[in-house]
């Protein structure tokens, strides 16, 4: 099967997640192409793919504009073929924020008009050494509020790699049996 993984990333974790999923799919015998939607490549034709994985991270309660533009431009094809949406956020890392992570997915599907076959809330990462003062304050006083054990100047990954791999396999199972 030929799959396109289209992604948008701000700090690089969604790129890492997309690459990891691509590697997994190749190991399973699939053809995979990665598309960074910020690069606006003209040589990728969505009609050429059998299924899609769309991945984007959440910043300031919204996914990147370029992924929404990609979905809008590809909507007819996306609706006609199997699709998985991966919404990457820190909200997905914390049980008490699950409703927020789910709301990000709902907002995305409402805005774009695309309802994928499966959606995943994927926990992201914190790279506080790259943040400006205001981002640091949001991280400390909102996102990691009451989570002193998680505060660190070192990068922290919250992505559940094994869980992600299992979810991708679940998405593929009905497609592989066709």
Q: What are the functions of these language-model segments?
A:
Residues 28, 51, 60-178:
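FMN-binding flavodoxin-like domain, especially the glycine-rich phosphate-binding loop
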Residues 28-41:
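A short beta-strand-loop structural module common to alpha/beta enzyme folds
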Residues 56-57:
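Glycine-rich, N-terminal phosphate-binding loop of Rossmann-like dinucleotide-binding domains
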């Amino acid at each position: 099967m030929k799959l396109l993984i289209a992604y948008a990333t701000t700090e690089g974790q969604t790129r890492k997640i997309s690459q990891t999923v691509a590697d997994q799919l190749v190991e399973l015998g699939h053809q995979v192409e990665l598309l960074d939607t910020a690069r606006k490549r003209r040589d990728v034709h969505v009609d050429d793919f059998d299924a899609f994985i769309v991945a984007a991270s959440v910043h300031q309660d919204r996914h990147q504009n370029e992924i929404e533009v990609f979905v809008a431009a590809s909507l007819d094809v996306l609706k006609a073929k199997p699709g998985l949406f991966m919404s990457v956020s820190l909200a997905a890392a914390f049980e008490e924020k699950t409703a927020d992570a789910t709301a990000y997915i709902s907002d995305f599907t409402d805005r774009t008009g695309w309802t994928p076959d499966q959606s995943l809330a994927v926990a992201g990462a914190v790279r506080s050494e790259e943040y400006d003062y205001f981002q640091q304050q949001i991280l400390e006083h909102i996102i990691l509020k009451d989570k002193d054990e998680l505060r660190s100047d070192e990068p922290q990954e919250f992505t559940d790699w094994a869980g992600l791999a299992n979810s991708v396999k679940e998405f593929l199972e009905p497609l592989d049996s066709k």
